[in-house]
Swiss-Prot record:
This is NADPH-dependent 7-cyano-7-deazaguanine reductase. It holds the Pfam family QueF. One of its GO terms (molecular function) is preQ1 synthase activity. It comes from Rhizobium etli (strain CIAT 652). Pathway: tRNA modification; tRNA-queuosine biosynthesis. It is found in: Cytoplasm. Substrate binds at residues 75-77, 94-95. Catalyzes the NADPH-dependent reduction of 7-cyano-7-deazaguanine (preQ0) to 7-aminomethyl-7-deazaguanine (preQ1). One of its GO terms (biological process) is queuosine biosynthetic process. NCBIfam families: QueF-II. It comes from the Bacteria.
Amino acid sequence: MMPNTDVSSLSMLGQQTETAKSPEEAVLEKVPSNHAGTDYVVRFTAPEFTSLCPMTGQPDFAHIVIDYIPSEWLVESKSLKLFLHSFRNHGAFHEDCSIYIAKRIVELLDPKWLRIGAYWYPRGGIPIDVFWQTGKPPEGVWLPEQGVATYRGRG
């Protein structure tokens, strides 16, 4: 029998929800993991992430991959989607967006392990890729490659 997940504390799932005006205002929610004690990888992929250049206000685009090994909690996916969307009108450098996303999730979940790969499309002709992780993943966990090809342009 599948365990039931208590969703009574969630405020966004199943509700019409406004997008926060900034990442700082955005609410991330969590649900209990029914598999605490089992090491497995959860992956979220945001292939159309957008934010704004803090200098020019022009849009920046990235393909973001977040992998984590839960401890007691899982990030609720609608809240993550809205959190990521809150960057759409937010001006910040690529590195700041990428690391802020990862640290907010770590703060919320206290996962056993987390990594982020943020593959930014070129700005000024140079693609910027940002990688960060909390440490080494636990032994024996299947950790697939993130699968995002290096930017090649028309080459």
